[in-house]
C-alpha cells in the first residue's frame, strides 16, 4: 500500500501531438460502449472503431462553465500512465463512452486522444482533465470513467490528486469519494478502468497509482 502525502501542488507537463487514426484492434464482446443509465453497471468493451476521420489536434478548453475548444500549445498536455505503462485513453469517440487504459505499443494509432490537460476545477483544490483532441472531460460515472462535455458545474468531473511516497498519485473522484483503479496484470492488451475504495492498492489484480507523464507523440527516426 502506498502512503499518501499530506498536500499536493501539481501542475505542468510537456506534450506534443500525433495525427493518426484509430486502428482496428478488436476486443471481446460487441455490446455498446455507451455509458448505461444504471450507476451499478461495469464498463463493457467492444471492438475498436475503425475508419475514424482525422481530428483537429492541440485542443483544450477556455473559460466558462461549458468551455469552448480552442487551439493551444502542446506543452499544456500530459498522459495519465499506470505502473504497467498503460495510458488512460478515450476509446469510442462519441461523448459519454467509457475510458480504458492501453499501452502505447497497442494504441499508437489513437493519436492525441491519449493526451490530457490538467486544469483547476470549480473548487480550486481539485482538478479536471480535458482531452487534447476532443475537448471533453473525464467524468466519474457508475463504477468507471467516461468522457463528456466539460462543465464547471459537474462535480463528477472534479478529481483530487493524492501524492504517494513513490512519486505517483492516486486519483480520487470528488463526487463519489472513490479512486481510479485499473488491473495492471491483464490477459488482454488493455486494462479496465474502474472506481473503487481508496486504499492506494498496488496488487496484480488492482492498482490505484498513476503517473503524470509526458504526452505521447509520433517519433521520427533521425538518420
From Swiss-Prot:
Residues 1-15 form the signal peptide. It comes from Haemophilus ducreyi (strain 35000HP / ATCC 700724). Keywords: Cell outer membrane, Lectin, Lipoprotein, Membrane, Palmitate, Signal, Toxin, Virulence. One of its GO terms (cellular component) is cell outer membrane. CDTs are cytotoxins which induce host cell distension, growth arrest in G2/M phase, nucleus swelling, and chromatin fragmentation in HeLa cells. CdtA, along with CdtC, probably forms a heterodimeric subunit required for the delivery of CdtB. Changing residue 102 to G: Abolishes toxicity towards intact cells. Residues 91-102 are annotated as: Mediates binding to target cells. A lipid is attached at residue 16 (S-diacylglycerol cysteine). This is Cytolethal distending toxin subunit A. GO terms for molecular function: carbohydrate binding; toxin activity.
Amino acid at each position: 500500500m502506498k502512503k499518501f502525502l499530506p498536500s499536493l501542488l501539481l501542475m505542468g507537463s510537456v506534450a506534443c501531438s500525433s495525427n493518426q487514426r484509430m486502428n482496428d484492434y478488436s476486443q471481446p464482446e460487441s455490446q455498446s460502449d455507451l455509458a448505461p443509465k444504471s450507476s451499478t453497471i461495469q464498463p463493457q468493451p467492444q471492438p475498436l472503431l475503425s475508419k475514424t476521420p482525422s481530428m483537429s489536434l492541440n485542443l483544450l478548453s477556455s473559460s466558462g462553465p461549458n468551455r469552448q475548444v480552442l487551439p493551444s500549445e502542446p506543452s499544456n498536455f500530459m498522459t495519465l500512465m499506470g505502473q504497467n505503462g498503460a495510458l488512460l485513453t478515450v476509446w469510442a469517440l462519441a461523448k459519454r463512452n467509457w475510458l480504458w487504459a492501453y499501452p502505447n505499443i497497442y494504441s499508437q494509432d489513437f493519436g492525441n486522444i491519449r493526451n490530457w490537460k490538467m486544469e483547476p476545477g470549480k473548487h480550486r483544490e481539485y482538478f479536471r482533465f480535458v482531452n487534447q483532441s476532443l475537448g471533453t472531460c473525464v467524468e466519474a460515472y457508475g463504477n468507471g470513467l467516461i468522457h463528456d462535455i466539460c462543465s464547471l458545474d459537474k462535480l463528477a468531473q472534479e478529481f483530487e490528486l493524492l501524492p504517494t511516497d513513490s512519486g505517483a498519485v492516486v486519483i480520487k473522484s470528488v463526487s463519489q469519494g472513490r479512486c481510479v483503479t485499473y488491473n495492471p496484470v491483464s490477459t488482454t492488451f488493455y486494462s479496465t478502468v474502474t472506481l473503487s475504495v481508496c486504499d492506494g492498492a498496488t496488487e496484480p489484480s488492482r492498482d490505484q497509482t498513476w503517473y503524470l507523464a509526458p504526452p505521447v507523440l509520433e517519433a521520427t527516426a533521425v538518420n
